[in-house]
């Protein structure tokens, strides 16, 4: 159940942050790129979100199988967030002719920071709700 709830939280938080950035706040920023599809294929992005969320909740469980803390949730989320956002923030403007490299970096890093901070809080909180009381309870939960 904790993995399902964590994955659901990641989907909601990702759509809230990235969707708001792409479709409301930074529309001109993304339209200026000139290579985006007129109609994005949301299924492919959704698959990526599911894979990323599954990996993060699984890693937190491996790190703290008897129950995590909000602090550990933040560490896992921010670690993966830094890993994932480093490509989009730095490698993408190196390859693509973005109008302003520093604007690109600022937008991508700030939105990613918001996304992964909120998810880290949610991830740690959700996992903390499922703390095993004894080793036998832990074995039953697995």
Predicted regions and their residues:
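Juxtamembrane/disordered regions of integral membrane proteins
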Residues: 1-142
């Amino acid at each position: 159940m904790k993995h399902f709830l964590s994955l659901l939280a990641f989907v909601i938080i990702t759509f809230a942050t990235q969707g708001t950035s792409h479709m409301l706040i930074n529309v001109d920023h993304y339209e200026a790129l000139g290579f985006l599809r007129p109609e994005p294929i949301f299924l492919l992005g959704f698959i990526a979100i599911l894979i990323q969320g599954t990996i993060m909740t699984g890693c937190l469980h491996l790190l703290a199988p008897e129950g995590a803390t909000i602090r550990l949730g933040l560490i896992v989320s921010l670690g993966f967030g830094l890993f994932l956002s480093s490509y989009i923030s730095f490698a993408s403007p190196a390859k693509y002719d973005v109008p302003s490299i520093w604007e690109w970096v600022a937008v991508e890093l700030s939105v990613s920071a918001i996304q992964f901070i909120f998810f880290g809080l949610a991830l740690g909180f959700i996992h903390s709700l499922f703390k095993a009381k004894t080793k036998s309870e832990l074995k039953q939960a697995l």
